[in-house]
From Swiss-Prot:
<dbReference type="Pfam" id="PF14943">
    <property type="entry name" value="MRP-S26"/>
</dbReference>
<feature type="modified residue" description="N6-acetyllysine">
    <location>
        <position position="159"/>
    </location>
</feature>
<feature type="transit peptide" description="Mitochondrion">
    <location>
        <begin position="1"/>
        <end position="27"/>
    </location>
</feature>
<comment type="similarity">
    <text>Belongs to the mitochondrion-specific ribosomal protein mS26 family.</text>
</comment>
<comment type="subunit">
    <text>Component of the mitochondrial ribosome small subunit (28S) which comprises a 12S rRNA and about 30 distinct proteins.</text>
</comment>
<keyword id="KW-0687">Ribonucleoprotein</keyword>
<keyword id="KW-0809">Transit peptide</keyword>
<dbReference type="GO" id="GO:0005763">
    <property type="term" value="C:mitochondrial small ribosomal subunit"/>
</dbReference>
<dbReference type="InterPro" id="IPR026140">
    <property type="entry name" value="Ribosomal_mS26"/>
</dbReference>
<keyword id="KW-0007">Acetylation</keyword>
<keyword id="KW-0689">Ribosomal protein</keyword>
<protein>
    <recommendedName>
        <fullName>Small ribosomal subunit protein mS26</fullName>
    </recommendedName>
</protein>
<keyword id="KW-0496">Mitochondrion</keyword>
Amino acid sequence: MLRALNRLAARPGGQPPTLLLLPVRGRKTRHDPPAKSKVGRVKMPPAVDPAELFVLTERYRQYRETVRALRREFTLEVRGKLHEARAGVLAERKAQEAIREHQELMAWNREENRRLQELRIARLQLEAQAQELRQAEVQAQRAQEEQAWVQLKEQEVLKLQEEAKNFITRENLEARIEEALDSPKSYNWAVTKEGQVVRN
């Protein structure tokens, strides 16, 4: 652009050319202070209706999805036509090979699925049998624990019954007092540090 302006401003007679620059309004740099009329101005964004914004956003999204799908469809169509035009018989042969390979892979997949299903059924049967055995063992152990608990409680009851025979009640209080008074036992004794019994 400067070269064109220099040609326009060339002077005859060997005088140096002068630039003809149009007076344009320049932009302020980021370091320049704001204008006096803009010092107290607060920039307020325009009001946006939330419902309208939601509708516009949804419509833009649908539009982009539609355009993307159309672009993908057209791209696939153009690529398919170019492939057919360039390859021809080779493309058809490759397509047949791909179909045959797909059929072989599907047959192998079905066979593998059948084999894995048989293994899965056998594993589930073994797990069910093991679970039944564990449940039977748990039930047997629980029955043994209950039986042991019942026996323990029976022994405790028998022990309490035996101890109850020696309990002092209102009925045998007088007899026990007489028996204690008539008893020749003496509890007036002590044990030394050496283990000797000292009686008075």
